[in-house]
Amino acid sequence: MPREIITLQLGQCGNQIGFEFWKQLCAEHGISPEGIVEEFATEGTDRKDVFFYQADDEHYIPRAVLLDLEPRVIHSILNSPYANLYNPENIYLSEHGGGAGNNWASGFSQGEKIHEDIFDIIDREADGSDSLEGFVLCHSIAGGTGSGLGSYLLERLNDRYPKKLVQTYSVFPNQDEMSHVVVQPYNSLLTLKRLTQNADCVVVLDNTALNRIATDRLHIQNPSFSQINQLVSTIMSASTTTLRYPGYMNNDLIGLIASLIPTPRLHFLMTGYTPLTTDQSVASVRKTTVLDVMRRLLQPKNVMVSTGRDRQTNHCYIAILNIIQGEVDPTQVHKSLQRIRERKLANFIPWGPASIQVALSRKSPYLPSAHRVSGLMMANHTNISSLFERTCRQYDKLRKREAFLEQFRKEDIFKDNFDELDNSREIVQQLIDEYHAATRPDYISWGTQDK
């Protein structure tokens, strides 16, 4: 019984990481850029139909919806070798093609105008699935389309498909360099409100950390977008391997999410990946064992979220899921878990069990890989709140001076007042407070005292 997943790609960032993701999936399943299964790909052990469906003439088409308010990125996809992979009916470009101008309010209000056309596409995809499990949304939170239209769609998806899961891959802006989007803190904060209230699970892709990993670990001097996006597609494909090469555990999205998210609002996940190498020379001097991979995943330098050091709060893991790919002896897994617990290599919440789960997954038989074992960590860690605190600090600076609010005032949602902004600030603050509360033993009764 396949549990299908529909991917929604929004805006420049969403479509670029989505494009890399589909490239990666095609390579892993032995599907050519035109969607034809390659001659060598005859093993029937993978489940292609979670992410693809078959057209009448046997070729595979991604269950993807490509949305943008300006044509550039989608045109570049349509001029690539993968142009014929997608269903052309699933591509939506807005009529006037002016984009959202990096303005959340513009993306949001354009969403109100065009949502019927978009939901025609989404409903058609949903009707074409046997038992739809949910939606995966790829977007960035700092721009206009991914954040504004993304926020609008998150709200509507909840109304329209209340029982379906919504998972997002949300790209957070790079804090190490100056942004050319001056209203980025506003956009981010408004989107965070929706990610808190309308998504079941948010995988945080932090550009700050991804750039650092590319420079420090992969030794790329000035990483380009496409190199960063390859990192992202590695994470995205690894986090879905258990769905595509099903084992006896974690073979659907809810299984993945349930083990990581014990309380509904704390659903922002960080990821770590190892071994990260682009050159083959390193591969020959390193023996990768399960313990090795699991220990490395706990090292901060492999974690793809750059979190601040907070001396006051004793930050800790709420839950960890390691997806280990490759040749693994299951007894080794048990031993590794024991070692990690005995040596207290990870600091866990005081109010619940130290939950480290391990999902073993096969690797794609069609891709050569330099390493016997590779691993992805998906972790729910309270320190992710430092990202939100950073956004709030930047927002407060701008809001105090009422800087750049003119562009927002043009749209209906902000015509009379900026309540929506202040309300979002409040909700993100509650989220931060709850993450801090989760580091204390009395978290279970948190939120009941003040009612």
UniProtKB/Swiss-Prot annotation:
Q: Where in the cell is it found?
A: Cytoplasm, Cytoskeleton, Microtubule organizing center, Centrosome; Cytoplasm, Cytoskeleton, Spindle
> InterPro entries per the record?
Gamma_tubulin, Tub_FtsZ_C, Tubulin, Tubulin/FtsZ-like_C, Tubulin/FtsZ_2-layer-sand-dom, Tubulin/FtsZ_GTPase_sf, Tubulin_C, Tubulin_CS
Q: Which residues form a coiled coil?
A: none
Subcellular location, principal: cytoplasm
Keyword GTP-binding in the entry? The reply is yes
Q: Which keywords accompany this UniProt record? A: Cytoplasm, Cytoskeleton, GTP-binding, Microtubule, Nucleotide-binding
- CDD domains documented for this protein: gamma_tubulin (cd02188)
Show the Pfam families listed in the entry: Tubulin, Tubulin_C
GO biological process, any: mitotic sister chromatid segregation
Give the intrachain disulfide bonds.
none
Keyword rRNA-binding in record: no
GO MF: GTP binding; microtubule nucleator activity; tubulin binding
Residues involved in GTP binding: A142, G143, G144, T145, G146, S147, G148
Q: Which GO terms describe its cellular component?
A: centrosome; cytoplasm; gamma-tubulin complex; gamma-tubulin ring complex; mitotic spindle microtubule; nucleus; polar microtubule; spindle
Family per similarity comment: Belongs to the tubulin family.
Could you tell me what this protein does?
A: Tubulin is the major constituent of microtubules. The gamma chain is found at microtubule organizing centers (MTOC) such as the spindle poles or the centrosome, suggesting that it is involved in the minus-end nucleation of microtubule assembly.
Q: What is the name listed in the Swiss-Prot or TrEMBL entry for this protein?
A: Tubulin gamma-1 chain
UniProt organism field: Xenopus laevis
